Amino acid sequence: MTNDRPLFIPVILGTTRQGRMSAPAAKLLCDEIGKRPNVATELIDIAQVPLPVDDAGQAIKDPSYAEKMNRADALVIVSPEYNHAYSGLLKHVLDSCLEEYIHKAVGIVGVSAGVFGGTRGIQGLLPVMRELGLVDIFWDVNISSVQDVFDDSGNLKDPSFLPRIDKFLKELIWMAKTLRYGRENIAAE
């Protein structure tokens, strides 16, 4: 069976800090996804997701965010690495949904000012992805020394990242198609 409905793969910008260097990376991923045939995307900036911080879980679910997660076939999470971890507010937003994520692909882009390209933050996110029911792909994109990768206008200065992003997106799209077929055609038990 084929499904002609375009895949929907939103990109989640996983930080709210001022001057965040993850924003150009998230925009780049949106641009690259947008070049793919039969794939739609949207940037989801967690700074724009209105969630209270004095409660947690599905009780605080934002209807717009939940609808996008329900519609998504896969996700790209662009996460900076802060002190060997991911953003606490990213976790807060992710935890606001549960069933919306089940059996959907996820790819993670790590961003850092240091040499590890967000690897430690990605490692911290992987068990969270599993607990949420997301299926992580085996390719990551690691953007190290992010301050040297994008210019002051947020444009990519280092085209060597494009083949990595291409490989990452090919795997994510394959997994998204496979999991969508399963969700739509195979009963979960």
Positions of the model-derived regions?
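N-terminal beta1-alpha1-beta2 submodule of the flavodoxin-like/Rossmannoid cofactor-binding fold
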Residues: 1-99, 156-189
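Short glycine-rich loop/turn motifs that provide flexible caps or phosphate-binding loops at active sites
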Residues: 13, 18, 87, 106-109, ...
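Mobile beta-alpha loop/short-helix "lid" or hinge segments that flank ligand
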Residues: 42-53, 99, 132-152
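His-Asp phosphorelay/catalytic-motif detector in bacterial-type signaling
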Residues: 102-103
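Short, glycine-/small-residue-rich phosphate/pyrophosphate-handling segment
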Residues: 106-146, 159-163
